[in-house]
Amino acid sequence: MKNNQPIIQFKNVSKQFDNDPLVLDHVSFTIEKGKFYTLLGPSGCGKTTILRLIAGFTEASSGDIIFEGKRINHIPANKRPINTVFQDYALFPHLNVYENVAFGLRIKKLKKSMIDEKVKEALSFVNLVGYENREIKDMSGGQRQRVAIARAIVNEPAVILLDEPLSALDLKLRYQMQYELRELQQRLGITFIFVTHDQEEALAMSDEIFVLNKGKIQQSGTPNDIYDEPINRFVADFIGESNITKATMIEDYLVEFAGKQFTCVDMGMNANEPVEVVIRPEDMEITSVEQGMISVTVHTQLFRGVHYEITCLDSEGNEWLVQSTKKAIVGEQIGLRFHPEDIHVMRFNESEADFDRRLDSYSEGETDGE
């Protein structure tokens, strides 16, 4: 059961190598017990550095790393109740499955009967009972990953760190392992911190996501919150497909873009404030020019299996991406429709704290109006 107690806290943590630019720039966040967290971002954003700082593989240049209320900056990795599953799994090729999983327990000098019991339990969690004597070289990529996870959980750590463990798997197996990892975390109740650059993985598995770019957390929240209410252009563009355009917030609940004014659900900004608007492609409905809110010309069309991916151009040269089960014809004029709640207004340079306060005020307004 999730108890909402903090287990890890970063307080203004920075990391710099030599005289290079900051890899992490005054990062602060809280990790709660029993949840599945994902650190999401492009290469070089700082996500793996955060993982290494938590594990104790590197030290912070400044700031405090807190574990269960105690500062652990200088506590070595082997003294932390944290285990890591690496991208290449880091299994011992000369040891079989049992010996790999039992390795950490043997270092602790536990009795053989206890080691046998714990290894069997760990292998049962990852559906590998009966594989104890299998050589690592004879196992598939998915099986090797399960061995690595069993080796991590057998020590009963408080936190498991996963450094892009699915990246080497083929697409079908990657999807399967997403389900298995999520189910395993929920059964164990252990805090998982997962690193990836794949936004689909993050959305599918996480209780909460931290989106990073250039050493800073851009936004944190549930998958739904981040997808539905991105804080800025980077997050909107990185999490899923997006239509992003410059706009003007005329007044509360009224925004102007593509040469027209549209009703929206956003408020609390300055009159005529320059903003950006994001509309997800799946929220754009194809209709006739007469019924459309925006008139566009179909530019390209690709069949993606579950939908058509259609790019369109409006009279001002803005490109609109539409995902629809309706087929369009390249060169034809069509109309696009969307609802006020499909329009998400983003302020320039808004802090996450201010952003959260603004969204909270929307909920308070709904409550007051009831």
UniProtKB/Swiss-Prot annotation:
Cross-referenced SUPFAM superfamilies: MOP-like, P-loop containing nucleoside triphosphate hydrolases
One Pfam short name: ABC_tran
Membrane topology: Peripheral membrane protein
Signal peptide: none
Subunit and partners: The complex is composed of two ATP-binding proteins (PotA), two transmembrane proteins (PotB and PotC) and a solute-binding protein (PotD).
Function of the molecule: Part of the ABC transporter complex PotABCD involved in spermidine/putrescine import. Responsible for energy coupling to the transport system.
The protein's name in its UniProt record: Spermidine/putrescine import ATP-binding protein PotA
